[in-house]
Amino acid sequence: MPEPNLCRHCFSVLEEGETVCSACGQKPEAPNPDAALPLGTVLSGQYRVGMVLHHNDLLTTYLGWDTEKDRKVQVEEFFPGILKRAEDGRGIMLISAESKTLFRTMASDLHDRWKRLMEVNHKAMLKTLVLFSENDTLYRVTEYLRMEPLEEYLSRQKGEMSLTDARQLISPLISLLSQLHNMGLTHCGISPQNIYVDSRKRVILDGFALPELRTVGNGLHAELYAGYSAPEQYSKALWQGEWTDIYSLGAVLYRMLAGQAPVSAELRGERDDYLAPLGKLHPDLPEHVCEGIMKALSVDHKQRYRSMEAFSAALLEEAGANTAVFRPEAPPRPTEKPAAAG
């Protein structure tokens, strides 16, 4: 059976004579950005590169096509800001030779993190299909699911979400983060931009990176999320840990229930805090839910919950009930690590 005529950008089937893809709106001749791999590049002899989905100072993420299994995939390329594209359009070059050690260190840390993520089997995370090295850099291929960012999903809700719906969306994320934390891994990029929802309300957490990308002053242009990144992420002198993810998840819940994002952590202080209490914005919410979310959003990380299980128990427990909606058994915690340690 002949291969259908696919759009070079999004791999949707093009109808005969179609000059602009009806799915993504791109013309076949339109190229990828200069710093990205060219459209049609085949990696590992199997994965064809399509459009750029996201780019930051650490990774370039592409939509890909698995030529062996005829399916869409997601391809992440380690391409930090200290690199530029080689003349052949595929390889990489250091902008400055002085960055060689930094590149090697980040590559090693990223490879280790990706290998750890391969150990995770959870419905709220994209499954890693393969890791490989090519073009003098690293690649990770994951499954691809057609979903929309939570940010867009919430904008269509036209205001706050019900507590029942918020719990339905957040419970799988609490379960996933509990598993990651028990492995000694944190996300530190939780926001409505990195959470995805499908038509059946399945939720996925994506946007995994290195701590260097999630901390100001750590060698990369930090990719933080106003209102969702924790105060400690705005200084490399402060410690990050489970409590950082708890802050961000609390901020996501605040957005869901209040209908507005929390004020940025940069504008908050322990004395002068401009964050409106959730109970004042939504007085119909149960008091213990409001208190739980506001505790998670404490400026001082020592005042927050110290584990996802504790946050879950306080937040998801029905008033007067003896059991929580989600309360997994947790093994002993790994030793806390500073932000720069990964």
What residues fall within each predicted segment?
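Conserved short submotifs of the Hanks-type protein kinase catalytic core
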Residues: 135-149
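Activation segment signature within eukaryotic-like protein kinase domains
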Residues: 169-170
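Conserved end of the kinase activation segment
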Residues: 232-242
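AlphaC helix of the eukaryotic protein kinase fold
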Residues: 87-119
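AlphaC helix of the protein kinase catalytic domain
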Residues: 150-161
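Conserved HRD-motif arginine in the catalytic loop of eukaryotic-like protein kinases
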Residues: 304
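Protein kinase catalytic-loop region centered on the HRD/HxD motif
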Residues: 173-185
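Activation-segment/catalytic-loop signature of the eukaryotic protein kinase fold
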Residues: 131
